[in-house]
Amino acid sequence: MEYDYIIIGAGSAGNVLATRLTEDADVSVLLLEAGGPDYRMDFRTQMPAALAFPLQGRRYNWAYETDPEPHMNNRRMECGRGKGLGGSSLINGMCYIRGNAMDFDNWAKAPGLEDWSYLDCLPYFRKAETRDIGPNDFHGGDGPVSVTTPKAGNNELFHAMVEAGVQAGYPRTEDLNGYQQEGFGPMDRTVTPKGRRASTARGYLDQARSRPNLKIVTHALTDRIRFDGKRAVGVDYLQGEAKDVTSARARREVLLCAGAIASPQILQRSGVGPAALLNRLDIDLVHELPGVGENLQDHLEMYLQYACKKPVSLYPALQWFNQPKIGAEWLFNGSGIGASNQFEAGGFIRSREEFAWPNIQYHFLPVAINYNGSNAVKEHGFQAHVGSMRSPSRGRVQVKSKDPRQHPSILFNYMATEQDWQEFRDAIRITREIMAQPALDEYRGREISPGPEVQTDEQLDAFVREHAETAFHPSCSCKMGEDEMAVVDGQGRVHGLEGLRVVDASIMPLIITGNLNATTIMIAEKIADRIRQRTPLPRSTAEYYVAGNAPARKQ
């Protein structure tokens, strides 16, 4: 079996590459996915409101666990990653958030990353997107990713929470992906006009599946990348339950798109990574790159939960006897509660003046429940998810053996710096001030969590240690750049090797201010043009907000 390109991982990035590369009819592509198909009749992945379900099983979730996190009471924390066509876009929360313009301008300050500025990236965000209310300078109108905007008549709690943020002195913004990210406003979601999850399997692969030059193999677990000297020449993978590997050869390039946990793991297993680690595991060294698996970053978040005095929350939707009607309305009409991820409002603020752009993100949810669907409060309630955006803490991913079925050792090293603790204390206190605003007076009942007795720095820190959870945004473990810890250059090419790129969230040099999926897709769109040797899309000329001397909060 020989192909021009072999793509490892049919996730948010891999499906973009598979679709774009096979637009050239003379180019053959093999797309390998360790998980199974994205079954379109499975409401768990297709119904936006069911987003908690795929995280609970193993069919669509790798369900990794971290090593005991030293600053988090030594908890082993969950690290869910998507498995199946679509990757994490098949199980994520569907929030369409791109990050702040300053994130990309900051990336572009690093040598070799000059063309990753916001105005260089914006055309690729637009290329990927079809926004339901039409294109403008910031949004696309004919891309593969369906983006749905919140509509009039949605839950009144969304509007009350945004108003409360504005009353507390923070900006209002009409579009968190537009001119100004900073502030509170409506949040877009990756959902189709028919109310289905817009994974990259649906948006991208559906265009490409029928092409004769694309072969998709599911249940194909990559064992390792094969090299001839310093050149990647193919991939060995295990098909289904098979004990023997299947080999495929790549004439041009191997494209590793397995995500921030699996991509460094596959590189290390293939002999690319820190020499001491590979020697310890008796893995033959192909090329020493000390940064493979290092620089791991994530977002941590907490829930602040309140009882709701007015019976307008989604609590009734959690009761089994109401669910058949919700399911039927979604199935047949593509509308109703089932068609939304219920994260229809949120925002970004600066907790202190020293931050040049927002460092805290909010998601508002009109029900009191854990992200994975557990511990639902048995009454009407609402909550704010809040967390810091650019933690200075750094973790790592390390392969434990040559066995591709063994999960790696993962340590995020959450909350390792004083800045982390300061940001979370600030975030809880600011959230309480927002929740105390008049806009929420008719809704706000008692504080359920953390609870009104949790007030001192020590009490807040203890709450964070015990209750903060991942936002499922692992990234940066094979970072782009030119320094000694960089793994790839600005086009995703692995340093010191030929015919091998990494294209996924692992190559972000620094984590972005917001959810990762939209940016992961943009990265793949941008590098796809590089692989095809096409002229990059012309830079955008859109103007965008920079806070400058503007106060973080009006008094």
From Swiss-Prot:
Could you tell me the gene encoding this protein? betA
Q: Which PANTHER family match?
A: CHOLINE DEHYDROGENASE, MITOCHONDRIAL (PTHR11552:SF147), GLUCOSE-METHANOL-CHOLINE GMC OXIDOREDUCTASE (PTHR11552)
Cofactor(s) needed by this chain? FAD
Q: Where is the signal peptide?
A: none
Spell out the NCBIfam families in the cross-references: betA, PRK02106.1
Q: Which GO terms describe its molecular function?
A: betaine-aldehyde dehydrogenase (NAD+) activity; choline dehydrogenase activity; flavin adenine dinucleotide binding
Quote the pathway field. Amine and polyamine biosynthesis; betaine biosynthesis via choline pathway; betaine aldehyde from choline (cytochrome c reductase route): step 1/1
The segment annotated Disordered runs over 180-202
List this protein's GO terms for biological process. Answer: glycine betaine biosynthetic process from choline
Residues reported to bind FAD: 4-33
For this UniProt entry, what's an example GO CC term?
membrane
The family annotation for this protein states: Belongs to the GMC oxidoreductase family.
Q: Catalytic positions?
A: H473
Q: Which named protein is this?
A: Oxygen-dependent choline dehydrogenase
Q: Which Gene3D superfamilies match?
A: FAD/NAD(P)-binding domain, Glucose Oxidase, domain 3
Return the broad EC class. oxidoreductase
